[in-house]
Amino acid sequence: MAPHTCQGIGDAACVIIESIPATYGFPMPLPGYLAAIKAACEKVGTLFIADEVQTGLMRCGALWGVTRYGVEPDLMVIGKGITGGIYPISCCVVSKRHAGWLSEDGFGHMSTAGGAELGCIVGLKVLEICQRPEVASMVRYISNFIRAGLDEIRDHHADFFTGIRQHGVVMGLEFNHPEGAKPVMKHLYENGVWAIFSTLDPRVLQFKPGILMTQELSEELLRRVEVAVGAARREILGSAQRKTV
């Protein structure tokens, strides 16, 4: 959403926005961008809904990534990591100001997979763990450690691995080929690492290390990334060279 398009959002009940869009390869919001959209929403009475499935739960160094940009959303969508992969659950979190209908109409929030009591228990524990001070410290350490290693890998393959987008452990790795992230994904998978290319920008690999990784595991991850990027580079550049002969 371009800032000038906010002028017409008064006709909309809500604006749903992914704090850092995953399928675009995690382009980082410009300073003031999300805050400007929230201000425009408030001006005309439109709700701001933040999709925090990818960026929440300390991945950006705060419990919710959108708050790192000075924004308090009216509603928030979370899932996946909320139960650490142990029990499937997703959530729509509503601010008190806009939650009256939940008590007025008990059927208003029913769903096919609703009432996940076990999932709620697991989710509460995950939230408690994420808010421990040592977890915030770990996120800072892991993001800095892995970034330093990725910078070295990029230096080794500068004609192919060209950029790193990052906020905490949310990262987009840029490659100098229209679909450069696809062979990197393939070779990572062959080396036991799961990271997917960005559907709407296949040059970029979505790369999100876990927030509780040890130094040893981080080092092993970087070794495997080095192997995968090198193999993808040879595959891509070798193919390009053969076409020019």
Task: Please report, for each region that a protein language model flagged, where it lies by residue.
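Conserved N-terminal phosphate-binding loop of PLP-dependent enzymes in the Aspartate aminotransferase
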Residues: 1-245
